[in-house]
Amino acid sequence: SPRDMLSRLETMVLMAGVDLPVRAIREQIASAADLIIHQSRLKDGTRKIVSITEVQGLEGDVIVLQDIFTFVQTGVDQNGRVQGYFKSSGVLPRFMDRFEAYGIKLPLTIFNPDYSEEVKNDTSNPSTGKLSRRFFDGVLRL
């Protein structure tokens, strides 16, 4: 999970012998990362993006995370492959102004909480799902 990734990153810094307080490590992590893209191996053996989470900063001693999109599994097809869709949390990410500054225009409707986009199993294209292609094309340009 994105939260687990942050804990592991913090642990790696501590194991490296760097003499920094935990708060300083968290401040560095929170200021360095804007998004966490969580990819997971599913029960069918495929890997899929299962969440896109924004790092919103530090609140007290806690790195604040906000899911933007999550993958919702709806079942499996006749071949045993996981089926599902991306669901928006309804939160407009704070980095949208940076996207616009780089000329990346995403339709705001994809951030509507009622918006979801089915993920098609297309073995010829590892980046399945229209949302993932559209969104990640923008993310990768940053």
Predicted regions mapped to residue ranges:
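NTP-binding/hydrolysis catalytic cores, primarily Walker-type P-loop NTPases
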Residues: 48-142
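Conserved P-loop NTPase nucleotide-binding/switch module
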Residues: 1-60
